[in-house]
Each structure stands twice: as C-alpha cells, then as structure tokens.
Amino acid sequence: ISHKNELLVFKGPNRLSVHRITGSSPTGADAFARVPFVTGVGGINHNGLFRINDDLVFPSPRGIHSLAATAAFGDYVEAFLARPILSHYQDSLNHSALSTNWGVNFQSKGLAIWSFAPSGSSTKSVYLVYDYRFQPGRWASWGINTPYVAANCLAVMQTTGRKHTLFAGTEGGYVHQLTVSD
C-alpha cells in the first residue's frame, strides 16, 4: 500500500513483517530495494488493511495494529491497537480463518470495522468495531453472543441522498444494509 509517499509491503501470516520499497527505478544508482521496517508484526490480508486519518490499521495473527504505534514501539504488546480486547481477539476468533477477514473505515461515523469468524465457525459473523473519535479509542463487538449478519465483505457507499451507508455482502450473493439510522 502507498502511504505518506512510501510503498509498504505487509508480509504474513507466518513470518510477520512490514517492509518499505525504496528507489525510483529497476536499475542504477536509485534502484528499487526492500528495506525491513518492523518484524514480529505484519498483515494477514489486504482486505483488512485501511487508512484511519493519518495512520494505517491492520489485523495480524497477534492482534489489530496501528502503523504509527508499530513504528514507534515495534511488536510491543502494550502498543497494539486492540490491546483492550486482545484476549477476546486471541481466544474467541477462528485463527485458521483470520486471513478471510474484511475491514472498512466508516469515516462519517468514526468507526473502523472488521468482520471475523468466531471460534468453531468459518462464517464471518462477528464484527470488531473501533471508535476512533475518542482518545483512547473505544472497542465494541457486534455478534459476540448472537451471530450478526454474515459478512463475506464490507463496504461503505454513498446513497443517492449523499448519506454514507454500511453494507455487508454475504456468501449467498445478498447485500445487507447495516446502517439503519443515525
């Protein structure tokens, strides 16, 4: 992903790392090069990686991370974005299906939302929601006790009334509008 005039490559899910791609040409004095940025933290897929304001957020097998916090503190657990819900993330989600997660920035509401499969299921029916309007951010979960709409994918789209609306696409080909009111 391109972020702040840098090209970043997230490696995972086994050998976790983030790398910078430097250079401006395939050969010569300014040839492309891969420079390690951090090890021990990396992305598990491109669908869960997105921007929040001036930062990137992404899930890994170890938790949900902020690139800014990772740059400052590395893989220090206390700096994980999902630190307040880390035991839930590590104990209650299906880790063999983590790579199928989907995330979206619902910017008009100040929410970062990811869909995950709970333990014992391959259906992504649990949503982890990070409200970044507050400092520190606040976490919530939709579908933790009762499955929510199974979301194979998530999207925020602008309706004809210029209102941003959250949608979930299911494996059966249906699209559900998740935003029902302000």
Language-model features and meaning:
Residues I1-D182:
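Beta-sheet-dominated scaffold domains
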